[in-house]
A protein has these predicted regions:
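Bacterial Sec-dependent N-terminal signal peptides
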Residues: 1-22
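A conserved glycine-rich beta-strand in the N-terminal activation segment of trypsin-fold
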Residues: 60-77, 182, 251
Length: 691
């Protein structure tokens, strides 16, 4: 009776998954319980129409876009819809002061005008396969955790490599699930010729910018259009003017029926990572170390960038993409830490862990193996706490901070003898970073971050440059930075050219920027070595915790954490109550765009071109108007998504495209750790008018 009560209490604390709309499900492993729940909510498609490794199915219309976003194929000639913020870096690369596609938008009026993007690819999933037995077959009982990891990694590489050996157009990737308790093979086909077809002005595609990011109500037209190209046999090919539009296996039909409150909807895409099974010790470390470091350091860096971007168009274009990426994670970290505190996530996790402790105590088999599980986890997180915190600030300050250091590290890692395709891509990356760099801004950033890092960490973790600054430059960080940039050849086109042309008279290791890069890598290595022992035990402990949770809740319908593999989430269109006395509707209209512009007259985040405002003010929306004569812009649902889902197709019950998922809401920013059914919402861009 006591055990039954414990389980009832624990289930109320830990919902994986207690809600019909929670979960990021593997399409190739949808069980009966999940399919039943989807049908009860309104799904009208059989499972083999969602995922079928032998016949075209809905999953064949969904792509991983560049490995960082998702997309959906919507035409027989390879058109792909994704989010504007997913295509933002591509638009930026093609922009200049003379052709400001970021500000004005871009449209290719013919296929000849479509713009190539060598850095981009789209990835189609062909099939998945459970390879757990084969991977874990390489593990021996006598192995310690490091030996186990090495054996597992080797077998994962072997299994993945077998796919390409059989067919060079395919890629096999084995991923770990449930903390390394299961392993699945995904077989992909990549297409590397992806061209920009259309992008709205940023005043539409980024309307609200940082102010509205992660916020509902939302009025952002966050979409871009690209096209996939292939060779004349419809096979993957690198960019060539001779390539032709790709003809996909499956094209997502676009809904003409719209939606209403309570309508079934599902996203299919590539969510990046979640930590739903992470221990309270891991959550606390994330909050206090990596998240706080991002908040502190990026806040300093971005303030400098933003000031200069607002003052000069050429700087705005150069820095737009990197500012956008940096600020997105910066605000995310702020929101996650806020949610952890406000929603009591740590307290909920600790209560759940207390119930697991009791369950372990009452089960002899579990007690023998796991009696010290939480004690060991707590001890090992404590043992690496200070080094982990310093490393988080170190990475943000120096590896993600001054771009001169980033250039030096890329040059240090460059391999002229590598595969030609890899060499060319790396060269382009170096040249592109250099072309988007303003040295005066970078010097100011470096100086500011040297000061900020010193304030945030113990003196034990100060790299050698601080001794140099103290001894040689009288403690003046700016003087040190000025001297570094003046004496390094990497800050000049001539120096970069000498490296790229492999000039034998250029002694690269004598360059002070390269020397600094080596010092930074050395310190990073030292930090990793200091944390190696506790980190190894933490990996083991979190894996064991993941396993015991699933054994304890045997009747629960579990899903694995997101890991950048294809997932499906489902739910219904619905609003929510963010706080007492307030209710948010489930959709927004163009009326809200006009209201926000009027309310933020001097705010660049809400600046919109007069011609766009004129179109919206006219009210001539044709067939896209609803029964009130309004045109809807965005809607929300209780689907379960995370980063990487940006650009994910939002389908209705028939598998027809409603729009694209592009964001989550501020009140549920802790959703990567704990799903909050009353608060968590997916923000979607609408492609068609609701009925």
């Amino acid at each position: 009776m006591k055990l039954k009560c414990i389980l009832i209490v624990a289930c109320s604390l830990f919902t994986l998954t207690g809600q019909a709309d929670e979960g990021m499900w593997m399409l190739g492993n949808l069980n009966k319980q999940t399919r039943k729940t989807m049908k009860e909510l309104g799904l009208q498609m059989p499972a083999d129409k969602l995922y079928n490794p032998k016949k075209p199915s809905l999953k064949d219309a969904v792509v991983s876009f560049g490995g960082f976003c998702s997309g959906v194929v919507v035409s027989e000639d390879g058109l792909v819809f994704t989010n504007h913020h997913c295509g933002f870096s591509s638009v930026q690369q093609h922009s200049s002061v003379e052709h400001d596609y970021l500000k004005d938008g871009f449209v290719a009026r013919s296929r000849a005008e479509e713009l190539p993007n060598p850095e981009l690819y789209v990835r189609f999933l062909l099939r998945t396969e459970d390879v757990t037995k084969r991977v874990l077959g390489a593990v021996k009982p006598s192995m310690n955790e490091m030996e186990r990891s090495s054996a597992v990694d080797s077998m994962m590489m072997v299994i993945g490599g077998e796919v390409s050996l059989k067919d060079s157009t395919l890629l096999g990737v084995v991923d770990a699930y449930y903390g390394g308790n299961e392993f699945w093979l995904s077989v992909y086909r990549d297409f590397n010729d992806v061209r920009l077809v259309f992008a709205p002005p940023s005043s539409v595609g980024k309307f609200g910018w940082d102010t509205d990011n992660w916020v509902w109500p939302r009025h952002t037209g966050d979409f871009c259009v690209f096209r996939i190209y292939a060779d004349h046999k419809n096979r993957p090919a690198d960019y060539s003017p001779d390539n032709v539009p790709y003809h996909p296996e499956y094209v997502a039909p676009i809904s003409l029926d719209g939606y209403k409150e309570g309508s079934f909807c599902m996203t299919i895409g590539y969510p990046g990572s979640t930590e739903r099974y992470l221990s309270s010790f891991g959550i606390e470390e994330m909050m206090n170390n990596s998240n706080q470091a991002q908040i502190d350091i990026r806040g300093v860096k971005q303030a400098i960038w933003k000031r200069e971007m607002d003052s000069k168009d050429s700087i705005r274009i150069k820095y737009a993409s990197k500012y956008d990426e940096s600020s997105n994670y910066w605000k995310n970290s702020i929101g996650v830490n806020r949610a952890i505190r406000k929603l009591g996530i740590l307290e909920k996790k600790r209560e759940m862990e207390q119930e697991i402790r009791r369950w372990i105590q009452q089960n002899p088999d579990e007690r023998e193996k796991l009696l010290q599980l939480f004690t060991d986890l707590e001890l090992n997180y404590k043992n690496r706490r200070e080094v982990n915190r310093a490393q988080a600030y170190f990475i943000e300050s120096f590896l993600y901070g001054p771009e001169l250091v980033q250039l030096a590290l890329k040059i240090l890692n460059f391999d002229f003898e590598g595969e030609q395709k890899t060499v060319i891509a790396a060269l382009k990356d170096i040249v592109e970073q250099y072309s988007n760099l303003d040295l005066d801004i970078d010097k100011e950033v470096f100086t500011a971050l040297l000061k900020e890092y010193r304030l945030k960490v113990d003196t034990t973790f100060l790299p050698e440059i601080y001794h140099t600054i103290a001894q040689k430059y009288n403690g003046d960080e700016k003087a040190f930075v000025d001297s570094l940039y003046a004496s390094s050849e990497l800050t000049t086109p001539r120096g970069l050219k000498r490296f790229l042309e492999r000039d034998t008279t250029y002694q690269i290791f004598d360059d002070p920027a390269i020397s600094l890069g080596i010092d930074m890598l050395t310190m990073l290595f030292d930090m990793n070595m200091q944390m190696q022992a506790p980190t190894t035990e933490i990996i083991r402990g979190e894996r064991l915790l993941n396993g015991v949770i699933r054994r304890m809740y045997t009747s629960r319908n579990f899903y694995p954490d997101a890991n950048s593999t294809m997932r499906l989430s489902f739910g219904t269109v619905c609003g929510y109550t963010p706080f007492d006395g307030a209710e948010y509707d489930y959709y927004t209209t163009t009326k809200g765009v006009l209201e926000k512009v009027k309310a933020h007259v001097d705010d660049v985040d809400f600046a919109v071109q007069p011609e766009v405002l004129s179109l919206l003010s006219s009210g001539n929306f044709g067939r896209y108007a609803d029964e009130k004569g309004e045109m809807k812009v965005c809607f929300i649902s209780n689907n379960d998504i995370t980063g990487g889902n940006s650009g994910s197709a939002m389908f209705n019950s028939k598998g027809e495209l409603l729009g694209l998922a592009f964001d989550g809401n501020w009140e549920a920013m802790g959703s990567d750790i704990l799903y909050e059914p009353k608060m968590q919402r997916t923000i979607c861009l609408l492609y068609t008018s609701p009925s």
